[in-house]
From Swiss-Prot:
SMART domains: VWA. It comes from Sinorhizobium sp. GO terms for biological process: cobalamin biosynthetic process; porphyrin-containing compound biosynthetic process. Its main location: cytoplasm. Heterotrimer of CobN, CobS and CobT. Its EC number is 6.6.1.2. This is Aerobic cobaltochelatase subunit CobT.
Amino acid sequence: MSSNSKAKPTTRENAAEPFKRALSGCIRSIAGDAEVEVAFANERPGMTGERIRLPELSKRPTLQELAVTRGLGDSMALRKACTHARIQRTMSPQGADARAIFDAVEQARVEAIGSLRMAGVAKNLNVMLEEKYAKANFATIERQADAPLGEAVALLVREKLTGQKPPASAGKVLDLWREFIEGKAAGDIEHLSSTINNQQAFARVVRDMLTSMEVAEKYGDDDNEPDEQESETDEDQPRSQEQDENASDEEAGDDAAPADENQAAEEQMEEGEMDGAEISDDDLQDEGDEDSETPGEVKRPNQPFADFNEKVDYAVFTREFDETIASEELCDEAELDRLRAFLDKQLAHLQGAVGRLANRLQRRLMAQQNRSWEFDLEEGYLDSARLQRIIIDPMQPLSFKREKDTNFRDTVVTLLIDNSGSMRGRPITVAATCADILARTLERCGVKVEILGFTTKAWKGGQSREKWLAGGKPQAPGRLNDLRHIVYKSADAPWRRARRNLGLMMREGLLKENIDGEALIWAHERLMARREQRRILMMISDGAPVDDSTLSVNPGNYLERHLRAVIEQIETRSPVELLAIGIGHDVTRYYRRAVTIVDADELAGAMTEQLAALFEDESQRRGSSRLRRAG
């Protein structure tokens, strides 16, 4: 009786063990590292240090799902075997777009190495890539602006290195960009095959490609390159010849002999089901470790504002005098301390109320964080509620539980505060204090917060207008003032270091005019450069965009029209979640998700309520009504 119990899986998880063991062995063999830990969990697939995360299988996995899972494992194993993290880091170009393309092409390189050496790996990767692009709906893309350039370059590189056509679900993306890429970088592309086994030489060619495509600046011979004696100049050897042959045999067995892995897995599925769930959006990253981009995911274009101004008939006379500046650079430490003390004194009576609202928000977030668990797992916290099972049946294994991860753990929030003259007095002091306390609250909950401000450097046009006047007053100059975008707190800066920076908003003469559309684009681009899965942008303003210099030489709705176009672009074509709070100003006519408050003292409640609503589970938010105008 006991022997039968041992022979038959006793839990649903055990049914998948033969498949998981076989796949884990293949991954370690390809990676050439027996210490690699392979985990299957309801988390976004990824690789952190020595740990490779793969998605937990569904209850009844199909052959397609098994092949996709193998493809994900092969992709990450090849990355670990063939990519030297330090070389990748030091050779990486400047700029978010250039880095994204550079990383995508490196992933194409390592996958090409595996495909050329092992037929089983090639087949698994093909299935995984087909699934990846199908999920991203690339087949529906019709315009070049919607097609990610990085993915197109990676597809073209893969085609050149392996001779394989791109997956059918991604063919349109490459077709839209092929003429541009080959027209700009055909000569560089021809050198890729000869350097495929040398990461550093390959990276040099890719940087030349990016320069030819005008995505990255030209590099000198020694720019960003590691010393020769420290780098790997020999061919990448992801494993020994014996390992290579063994891995080939194992991978070939995956596809050619269903009786090995597929059949074993299928037979086990018939005997028992496995716990499974959809892959979550969360990507828990260990700080300080290299975390590769998830191979089974694709990112849509991160720059929805490429050529945007031209399309909406918005011009800028000159950007020569614009500035993006950290708040501490605008005044010295002593003045910042004095301004912060003044801010605290002005709002001493308000801090208690705002603090209570912030604590309420924190309790709601922490309740979400702690109330959701997964049960009947093979590892995690011991589930004391299931211990009676062992008394009833000693053959039952111990049961463990694990806390589920909620969406807000991998989230960044940007608070964009209008620093125009009309905010002077009560509105700006309340906004500064609310931003301060919310940043502290969200930081406690593991949510990163960025606080930005926008204004102009001068009244009545500043140096831009002077240049325009000196140039003979050309017609239709467009925006005619010097922008000042202020970083009060970056997303990665701890609250305690940035606290005093908010006092700058109290400085006499800081608040001038407001050009909202370009400020939104700026804040949006900063968010898009972040690695977090979820990005939220909250605008706090008290009126429509106003700049006397610009409006005196352009149509009266020039800035407002641009703002509306920017908002529509973010709301319809960007993954960033945009919401706005208007102080005494109806912002609901601009933003889909917006609330208007009558008095500045209502700001704290509005901010905490709207953020709390955003962080509610999707199922709870689905039935809730759209934000309504308040006040």
